[in-house]
Amino acid sequence: DLDIIQINNDLIAITVNWSNIIQFISPDGKRVAETEDVPNNRKLATDGRYVYVSSYGHECGTIDGYVTFTKGYVAKIDVRTFEVVATCEVGYEPEGIAYYNGYLFVANTGGYAFQEDHDYETTVSIIDAGTMQLKKNIDTGQINLYGKLSQSGQYLCINSPGDYYDIP
């Protein structure tokens, strides 16, 4: 899985899932920096100052040391230092992420439900991007919220492939 986002006029971020690498490049393709502190990274969002990345992982290297999680999490990366400065635990296997008006919206899939001891997720987590504190989880009533979380103004769209068998 791969995600690409333009942070500002000078910087692009790319997640390369399973390699655990987040690559930062210039618009002309030159390598600027990279981090391997966010294992099993998935999707990206930005406010222009920070990059936010969802992760299926259960640990993360931060400026304060390693942090562990029971579920998935979102990491906040400073684009000046390329270091993880904060994290927030969300639901199992968070996927799509969007930034809007100071908040992060994170679609939780629970996508490993078929092989781990938990159910598919039905929630979107809302995080205060400034404090990286979880504000609430909204139950959508749909399982396995998978893929890119698309934003158009105040509206968010995400797909739900169900459980791939019985639930559409």
Indicate where each model-derived feature is located:
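Residue position within the beta-strands of beta-propeller blades
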Residues: 14, 53-55, 106-107, 157-159
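Hydrophobic/aromatic beta-strand positions that recur at structurally equivalent sites within the blades
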Residues: 24-25, 77, 124-127, 168
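A short beta-strand motif characteristic of beta-propeller blades
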Residues: 1, 29-36, 83-88, 133-140
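Loop-centered beta-sheet repeat module
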Residues: 91-126
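Blade-loop segments of beta-propeller domains
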Residues: 1-17, 21, 31-43
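Repeated scaffold domains used in trafficking and secretory/extracellular systems
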Residues: 1-7, 39-48, 92-100, 142-152
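Conserved core beta-strand positions within WD40 beta-propeller blades
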Residues: 10-11, 50-52, 103, 155
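Short, solvent-exposed loop/turn segments at conserved positions within beta-propeller repeat blades
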Residues: 15-19, 60-72, 113-122, 164-168
